[in-house]
Amino acid sequence: MQLKRKEPVDPLKATVIVGKPWDEIFAYAEISKGDVMLSWIMKKLGLRGTLKSEADLVALVEERLPVVSISALLEHGILEKEIYSVIVPRRTLQHRRAREEKLSREESDRAVRLARLTSLAEKVFGDPDAGRHWLRAPKKRFRGRTPMDMIATETGSRLVEETLYQIDEGMAA
């Protein structure tokens, strides 16, 4: 369905379009795919505010994410074992929580990577559950490993991202 409007929309007064689970973050305004993905990432990490570009995301990683971002990821369907294997070991996370420390830059980067790729999978498959299911199922392309296993490394995450874009464009199954 194409929405038409006669006058520019003030994003601060934008109407929320509801229809699918992820639509709660879509505003009735002209938003690029990148902006939408940045909004999804922020939501998954439990962060408020608006990122204007990927450069803002880099700055966020450099400032280090709060530990509550891990809790937000768990609330969005990421499993504890996935947190421990992709982002931060269990004991390290326990220490960070006890000391009320932020995640390290590396952990923050991995958290953003996980949020970005789970958001992309949800977008491609049209549903959060379907996206997570795809990420957790072994794939021949990944030599029998799951996409979630591949996300643990930057190189693996690039392959997962490439595969998701190919699926989205109808070039892969």
Tell me what each language-model feature is.
Residues M1-A173:
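Non-transmembrane "mature" sequence context
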